[in-house]
């Protein structure tokens, strides 16, 4: 019976996907469908704006929102809230794509927690962004940041 119970527990836990909340803190996403895990990350509050950034050898993801609240924010070319992916090229939700059909940058960030006791921020995000020409696009999906440290600069 003990072996059966052990097998059931092993099968249960082997099917669980990795949860970033167990890896305090962290910042990761899929960029064009490939894993992107930040080696360094931080958040900054300045002039009532929240900036969250992560970077690794493949590039930098930055998100800026004009609020310091737990809420959802749309990332669009006409919005004050925006996201950037930068490798050798600068991609932004402030840029729209061009073509026979207008391709618009779009995305969303959900701030799930601002922990003032630990001075950290957690949430999820996704966005599609274009380079300055509007011809090249990056798709950033399944983004999550967990307990990213906040630096306050007022």
Task: Provide a role label for each language-model segment.
Residues 1-4, 18:
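Positively charged n-region of N-terminal signal peptides that target proteins for export
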Residues 35, 62, 108, 137-146:
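Well-ordered beta-strand positions in beta-sheet-rich domains
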Residues 114-154:
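C-terminal or internal capping secondary-structure element at the end of a domain, subdomain, or sheet
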Residues 13-37, 154:
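Bacterial Sec-dependent N-terminal signal peptides
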Residues 4-13:
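Sec-dependent N-terminal signal peptides
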Residues 27, 44-120:
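Surface-exposed helix/loop patches within compact recognition domains
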Residues 29-33, 54-56, 127-133:
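Short acidic, glycine-rich loop/turn motifs
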